[in-house]
């Protein structure tokens, strides 16, 4: 994971943001994305995608156009063919879901999650939209965890069911909402009303202390609210109940999050919506 001092600054229009990420993470992206074998590399150079990846990219460009442009910029910045980056981004949908946790108390809402390897810290400065501080994989346009200058914090899990009408993953809503909104209500309305593949979950907190989550299930989309001040998404009901119980009895700080998730504190991060900051490895990182 990137050190705080190594935060990547991605500014401008989406292609420029992606280019900055691709250039800064060139080595990691090439290690992850370059296909083995001369034939596969030749297909990448020709822009050829298998049918499932082509559909994924088509739906992403249609329903999340800024993130499609981001991918194009990241590929150029890393010196990669776009198909190679698309394959890596699409493959991340099959990663184990991140556990998402939200806690409220004394008018303050915090969210947190476990982080996968290779996560980087980046400062997004989009043209004409909210600035954000994010933890993300360098081959994905949307973060696992982020907070914006308006006081909205978002956490997301991976996951997308094959064969759904829309192939673009729901975790991409995290980037959309951070750029656009300052309240949980506005973010929920966006996620409930736009196409995306089922399978992901998202958590939201805002500076007014509101907390909510949404499960993008196969049959419908369910809004979730905290019970007893705690909300857990991304795991089955039994584990969620166990985590909620641990947090209900704990201080609800970053260490408590990690202990409840059964992870090392360095593998977890939190976001404080009101303070516009991320909490990572014992450090508070201000926007």
Q: What is each stretch, according to the model?
A:
Residues 1-99, 103, 179-287:
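C-terminus-biased signal that marks the final domain/tail of proteins
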Residues 25, 44, 62-172, 197-201:
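A contiguous strand-loop segment
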Residues 171-179:
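Short histidine-centered catalytic/ligand-binding loop motif
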């Amino acid at each position: 994971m990137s050190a705080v001092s190594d935060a990547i600054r991605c500014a401008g229009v989406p292609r420029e943001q992606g280019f900055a990420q691709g250039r800064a993470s060139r080595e990691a992206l090439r290690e992850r994305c370059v296909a083995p074998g001369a034939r596969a590399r030749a297909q990448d150079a020709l822009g050829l995608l298998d049918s499932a990846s082509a559909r994924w990219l088509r739906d992403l460009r249609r329903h999340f156009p800024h993130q499609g442009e981001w991918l194009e910029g990241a590929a150029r910045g890393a010196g990669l063919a776009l198909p190679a980056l698309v394959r890596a981004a699409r493959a991340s949908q099959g990663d184990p879901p991140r556990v998402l946790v939200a806690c409220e108390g004394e008018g303050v809402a915090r969210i947190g999650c476990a982080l996968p390897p290779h996560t980087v810290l980046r400062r997004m400065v989009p043209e004409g939209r909210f600035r954000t501080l994010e933890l993300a994989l360098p081959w994905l346009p949307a973060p696992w965890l982020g907070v914006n200058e308006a006081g909205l914090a978002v956490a997301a899990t991976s996951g997308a069911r094959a064969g759904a009408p829309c192939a673009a993953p729901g975790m991409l809503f995290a980037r959309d909402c951070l750029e656009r909104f300052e309240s949980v209500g506005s973010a929920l309305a966006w996620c409930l009303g736009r196409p995306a593949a089922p399978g992901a979950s998202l958590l939201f907190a805002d500076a007014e202390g509101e907390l909510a989550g949404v499960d993008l299930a196969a049959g419908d989309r369910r809004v979730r609210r905290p019970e007893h001040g705690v909300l857990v998404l991304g795991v089955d009901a039994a584990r969620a109940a166990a985590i909620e119980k641990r947090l209900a009895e704990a201080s609800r700080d970053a260490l408590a999050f990690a202990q409840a998730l059964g992870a090392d504190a360095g593998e977890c991060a939190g976001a404080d919506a009101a303070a516009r900051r991320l909490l990572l490895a014992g450090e508070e990182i201000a926007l």
